[in-house]
């Protein structure tokens, strides 16, 4: 498998334009779960192009975006250049360079599956303040439920260069157990979706590191198959790209009854 820190270097433009944001309820759920009464300091590990930081910044929190990939980090710096409460850090999740006990939350959004889990667990312990929280966040694409979703999953299985290996790493129960340790974690699920015309769908596909890039022998056949799928399943010129947004958060204290009921999502 290619070096995770370099997988997206040639896909940044599509990533910025076509990857989903996160439901606003994620930030509010964390606020309630963690008992925050004002702004806190957050380490965003594998912060990428800055999408995961936006909701926290809008809520007034300070975010330290830790990202090893230069192209992704520069995209985040451009997106968030006007945000005084965002700090961009050239670093890895396993070695953030943040000071000991300096943050209230460590979160990994759409990145945890690339980490050395034991090393990240140790680094999180080092940088968290007493009573701090760990969280993992994913937009998990639904692989079934409509003709489009079924067909898109089949397309990835057919053309994805290492799709099976990557998809198996998402929400791995053993990795999550190792990361959260004895305190365990709660899980919150939120519905989320994007609606794409063909240009958007093409960009969303090409933002994935396992999609054959231009010059690969399967690139054009893959796009032909994508066009055929879109033509067969679109309605009013759009397809629905649906997600389960899943938030895993540590539980040193229990969440309040006002929160969405924690539950383990059905993952495929």
Question: Where are the model-predicted features located?
Answer:
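Class I SAM-dependent methyltransferase SAM/SAH-binding core
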Residues: 41-43, 49-95
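Conserved class I S-adenosyl-L-methionine
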Residues: 1-40
């Amino acid at each position: 498998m290619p070096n995770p820190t370099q997988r997206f270097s040639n896909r940044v433009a599509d990533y910025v334009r076509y990857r989903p944001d996160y439901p606003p309820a994620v930030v509010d759920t964390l606020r309630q779960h963690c008992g925050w009464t004002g702004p806190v300091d957050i380490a965003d590990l594998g912060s990428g192009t800055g999408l995961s930081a936006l909701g926290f910044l809008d809520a007034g929190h300070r975010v330290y975006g830790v990202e090893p990939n230069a192209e992704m980090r520069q995209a985040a710096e451009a997106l968030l250049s006007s945000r005084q409460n965002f700090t961009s850090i050239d670093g890895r999740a396993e070695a953030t360079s943040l000071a000991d006990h300096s943050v209230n939350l460590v979160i990994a959004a759409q990145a945890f599956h690339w980490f050395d889990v034991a090393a990240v667990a140790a680094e999180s312990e080092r940088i968290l303040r007493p009573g701090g929280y760990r969280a993992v966040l994913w937009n998990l694409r639904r692989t079934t439920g409509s003709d489009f979703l079924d067909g898109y999953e089949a397309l990835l299985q057919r053309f994805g260069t290492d799709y099976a290996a990557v998809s198996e790493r998402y929400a791995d129960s053993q990795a999550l157990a190792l990361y959260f340790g004895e305190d365990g974690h709660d899980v919150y699920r939120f519905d989320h979706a994007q609606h794409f015309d063909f240009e958007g769908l093409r960009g969303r596909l090409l933002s994935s590191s396992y999609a054959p890039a231009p010059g690969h022998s399967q690139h054009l056949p893959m796009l032909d198959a994508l066009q055929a799928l879109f033509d067969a399943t679109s309605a009013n010129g759009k397809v629905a790209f649906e997600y389960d947004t899943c938030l895993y958060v540590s539980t040193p204290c229990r969440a309040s009854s006002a929160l969405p009921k924690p539950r383990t999502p059905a993952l495929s």
